Amino acid sequence: MFLSQVINCVAAVADWMRSNRLQLNDNKTEFIWCTTDRRQHLPTVGSTIGSFSATPASTVRDLGVYIDLDMSMRSHVRRTVSRCFATLRQLRTIRRQVPTTVFQSLATALVLPHLDYCNSVLYGLPTSLIRRLQSVQNATA
């Protein structure tokens, strides 16, 4: 019953997109099942609507926020921390060529926006995930 409603909703979105000369990209379309612990009762195969098909994913990205199956935000924090430390590693290659104040300004301008983006979805995270984000702030300072 519920799966047929989801399929009908996706079909309606695809029809609307077609009528507005837009195309649903099969390669970029993903979905997750947001349910209780009874996930084993959900279909694990993809759904097909016309030529469109999608399979359930363990993590999806929407507006730059990574949402995982259990809504724990672990994947979002992991990717954010990884991206920030990668930026810091790149900045360290020029550390000796620029004055300290310029380096600090660059680090602040290039790293902290990653932490600030969508930080309201991070409210109420476990302490372990907050510590990982704080380690980025400490490394940037």
PLM feature segments, named:
Residues 1-141:
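Hydrophobic/basic alpha-helical segments
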